[in-house]
């Protein structure tokens, strides 16, 4: 069982803040902590300084009169050898660190002779590009309160209210505020069309909203007995996961939407993800179990509905991510008692690799452009870690959050990642870079599955 709700009150709550406004932090002091007008004594050569102020001037006057090209070259070489080629007597900053020799000189020389072109290493910013306030975000490991739609609009649930932030314009709007007896909001997920959004509630209901008209289309109820903490779309099928351990497939086109119910988890379902093909569903629960469900074999009437039951994790599994470049490859992350990222072949059910990250794994995202995986973590560093796949070498660690990074979402072009944490901030990171083929995401037309939903309540 993993740590769920964090009741520790944040110091940010001492004053009211507007949601999704720029968050300004006090400027951090310089690491060197030097005054611009006071020399740094530890970086100065006092012997040379004394020589330059006394005898150095005399030497220059004498050599100027009898200067020759050969003597001048000798003087420069001698200055370099004796480390006397200074331009300043007073040092106002530390010397830059010498570059590390990664290869012996003979190897590096041979490499320079080869005409083979080497791809330059991508620059990964270590700080967030933008930080927005997210007051009253629920600090609960088992919920899913952030999603970025295909129309480039980010949805975030803050307590009882769902806000929409348009990444193209930077504008913010309120979609809905849930009644006190029904809330707070416990999950949110965009439909593939980027216009319709599902909102899971604490009272076991799920609401469907049209973001273009700010209108509620229908309410799904009766399937779950407790809060709905996870949602996942598969075309016209909305899959919901509840604290009751049930997973329900809802066909939003029909009046009685429940078409399948999966039973396998004994505790809350906190993670749901459909594969890119829409054929397999991965679910993670507070029972430390990952299930792989296949629509072609799963049936509500069968005793064993799942394709695979994966029990190697030792803590709650919320973080799930299907690989975009390799079929049947799933990454899963375990909670504070597990701390591992595991990779699975969902065709055979075999565990391909397991990596100890050292801290609670809250969320996982694959890069759409490179063979890279991003993970978000809790105590002690509350960092985002970028991994190279399949070597799982750390490429970067991004810090800035002061509480566990519970939620992550990826922009439609795959370049930017948004992260939300219990510190009540929403941060944006240019972690995956800008591919040459990246194009601005255009809003998609409303898909056919919702053509009849307006008439169903």
Curated annotation (Swiss-Prot):
Signal peptide: none
Described purpose of this protein according to its UniProt entry: Component of the anaphase promoting complex/cyclosome (APC/C), a cell cycle-regulated E3 ubiquitin-protein ligase complex that controls progression through mitosis and the G1 phase of the cell cycle.
Annotated PROSITE patterns: WD_REPEATS_1, WD_REPEATS_2, WD_REPEATS_REGION
Location, primary (coarse class): nucleus
Induction description: Expression starts to rise in the S-phase and peaks in the M-phase with a non-negligible basic expression level also in the other cell cycle phases.
Keyword Ion transport found: no
InterPro entries noted in UniProt: Cdc20/Fizzy, WD40/YVTN_repeat-like_dom_sf, WD40_CDC20-Fz, WD40_repeat_CS, WD40_repeat_dom_sf, WD40_rpt
Subunit description: The APC/C is composed of at least 11 subunits that stay tightly associated throughout the cell cycle. Interacts with APC10, FZR1, FZR2, FZR3. Binds to GIG1 and PYM. Part of the mitotic checkpoint complex (MCC); interacts with MAD2, BUB3.1, BUBR1 and BUB1. Binds to cyclins CYCA1-2, CYCB2-1 and CYCB2-2. Interacts with PANS1.
Name of this protein: Cell division cycle 20.1, cofactor of APC complex
Pathway(s) it belongs to: Protein modification; protein ubiquitination
Start-end of each WD repeat: 138-175, 180-219, 223-260, 264-303, 312-354, 356-397, 400-439
GO MF annotation terms: anaphase-promoting complex binding; kinase binding; ubiquitin-protein transferase activator activity
Pfam families: WD40_CDC20-Fz
UniProt note: phenotype after gene disruption: Delay in plant development due to reduced cell number and male sterility.
Entry keywords, A to Z: Cell cycle, Cell division, Mitosis, Nucleus, Repeat, Ubl conjugation pathway, WD repeat
Subcellular location: Nucleus
Free-text tissue specificity from the UniProt record: Expressed in meristems and organ primordia. Present in flowers, leaves, stems, roots, pollen grains and developing seeds.
GO biological process: cell division; protein ubiquitination
Family: Belongs to the WD repeat CDC20/Fizzy family.
Transmembrane regions listed in the UniProt entry: none
GO annotations of cellular component type: mitotic checkpoint complex; nucleus
């Amino acid at each position: 069982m993993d740590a769920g709700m964090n009741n520790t009150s944040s110091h940010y709550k001492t004053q009211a803040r507007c949601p999704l406004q720029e968050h300004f932090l006090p400027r951090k002091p310089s690491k060197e902590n030097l005054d611009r007008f006071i020399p740094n004594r530890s970086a100065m050569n006092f012997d040379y300084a004394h020589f330059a102020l006394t005898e150095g001037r005399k030497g220059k006057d004498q050599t100027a009169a009898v200067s020759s090209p050969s003597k001048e070259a000798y003087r420069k070489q001698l200055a370099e050898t004796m480390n006397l080629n200074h331009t300043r007597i007073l040092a106002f900053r530390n010397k830059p660190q010498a570059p590390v020799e990664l290869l012996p000189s003979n190897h590096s020389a041979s490499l320079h002779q080869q005409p083979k072109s080497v791809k330059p290493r991508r620059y990964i910013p270590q700080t967030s590009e933008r930080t927005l306030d997210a007051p009253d975000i629920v600090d609960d490991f088992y919920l899913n309160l952030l999603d970025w739609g295909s129309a480039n609009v980010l949805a975030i649930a803050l307590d009882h209210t769902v806000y929409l932030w348009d990444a193209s314009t930077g504008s913010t709007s309120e979609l809905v505020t849930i009644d006190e007896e029904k809330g707070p909001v416990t999950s949110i997920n965009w439909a593939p069309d980027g216009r319709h959004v599902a909102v899971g509630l604490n009272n076991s209901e799920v609401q469907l909203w049209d973001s273009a008209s700010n209108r509620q289309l229908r309410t799904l109820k009766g399937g779950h007995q407790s809060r709905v903490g996870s949602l996942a779309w598969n075309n016209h099928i909305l899959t919901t996961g509840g604290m009751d351990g049930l997973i329900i497939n809802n066909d939003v086109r029909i009046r009685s939407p429940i078409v399948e119910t999966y039973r396998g988890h004994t505790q809350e379902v906190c993670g749901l993800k459909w594969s890119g093909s829409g054929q397999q569903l991965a679910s993670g629960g507070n029972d430390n179990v990952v299930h792989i469900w296949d629509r072609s074999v799963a049936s509500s009437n069968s005793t064993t509905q799942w394709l695979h039951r994966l029990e190697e994790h030792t803590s709650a599994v919320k973080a799930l991510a299907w690989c975009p470049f390799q079929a049947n490859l799933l990454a899963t992350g375990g909670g504070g008692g597990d701390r591992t990222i595991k990779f699975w072949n969902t065709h055979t059910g075999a565990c391909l690799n397991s990596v100890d990250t050292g801290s609670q794994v809250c969320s996982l995202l694959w890069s759409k452009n490179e063979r890279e995986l991003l993970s978000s973590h809790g105590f002690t560093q509350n960092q985002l870690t970028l991994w190279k796949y399949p070597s799982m070498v750390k490429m970067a660690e991004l810090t800035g959050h002061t509480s566990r990074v519970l939620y992550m979402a990826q922009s439609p072009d795959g370049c930017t990642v948004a992260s939300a944490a219990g510190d009540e901030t929403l941060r944006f990171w240019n972690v995956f870079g800008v591919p040459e083929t990246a194009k601005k995401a255009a809003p998609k037309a409303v898909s056919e599955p919702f053509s009849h939903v307006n008439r169903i309540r």
